[in-house]
Amino acid sequence: MRVDIISVLPDFFDSPLANGLLRIAREKQRLQLHVHSLREYGLGKYKQVDDTPFGGGAGMVLRVEPVFACIEKLKADRDYDEVIFFTPDGKQFNQSEANRHALDRNLILLCGHYKAIDERIRETLITKEISLGDFVLSGGELPALIFLDSVARLLPGVLHDEESMLTDSFQDGKLDCAHYTRPSEFRGMKVPDVLLSGNHKKIEEWRLENAIERTRQRRPDLLKDINL
């Protein structure tokens, strides 16, 4: 998979891409990441990428010219499955979306900044808009990293234990069960006996029941789509 990230803050990605799972995905050549500075396509002596909004009002708006120039240059070299923009009014991102995008070959992630981006960019260039929730961030860089992490871990060979991925929360429509490790007792808090029993059938039954109960308590909305 190749992902091209467009941002006015390209250095923002240096540390996250050099550590953890994203570093592993790159080293294993499962993920090619290219970060493009939008200011390289800026206008005039000062490489301007934003301007005041028509009609007045607070904040600055990302201009059309730099974004068009960058994306058109990328598209001249290859086809892309999606051009994604992160925005609070986009489609809610979830595990199903991450699973789907793990099958893509080429993606462009446009990170917004300032108050907004010119609507003509959204109408013409953007093929998908994604929201992480009902809140506002200062830019699209953090959402882009969250998107990348959730997708990269699904790529073949990235996770050391791929079976672990199959039992993650949301993979089968419900939350994950509770987990414990050593010691079996700490300050009077004991691990459930069934997990120490060695009876794999009963352990799996406990985990399923625990996951369903946890989902019922914390995310009951998920259960309507599950046949229990």
From Swiss-Prot:
The keyword S-adenosyl-L-methionine applies. SUPFAM superfamilies: alpha/beta knot. It catalyses: guanosine(37) in tRNA + S-adenosyl-L-methionine = N(1)-methylguanosine(37) in tRNA + S-adenosyl-L-homocysteine + H(+). It holds the Pfam family tRNA_m1G_MT. GO terms for molecular function: tRNA (guanine(37)-N1)-methyltransferase activity. It comes from the Bacteria. S-adenosyl-L-methionine binds at residues 112, 132-137. Its main location: cytoplasm. InterPro entries: Alpha/beta_knot_MTases, tRNA_m1G_MeTrfase_C_sf, tRNA_m1G_MeTrfase_TrmD, tRNA_m1G_MTases_N, tRNA_MeTrfase_TRMD/TRM10. Keywords: Cytoplasm, Methyltransferase, S-adenosyl-L-methionine, Transferase, tRNA processing. It is an enzyme of class 2 (transferase). Disulfide bonds: none annotated. Gene3D superfamilies: 3.40.1280.10, tRNA(m1g37)methyltransferase, domain 2. Its EC number is 2.1.1.228. Signal peptide: none annotated. The keyword Transferase applies. GO terms for cellular component: cytosol. GO terms for biological process: tRNA N1-guanine methylation. It is found in: Cytoplasm. Specifically methylates guanosine-37 in various tRNAs. HAMAP family: TrmD. Homodimer. PANTHER family: TRNA (GUANINE-N(1)-)-METHYLTRANSFERASE. Belongs to the RNA methyltransferase TrmD family. This is tRNA (guanine-N(1)-)-methyltransferase. It comes from Chloroherpeton thalassium (strain ATCC 35110 / GB-78).
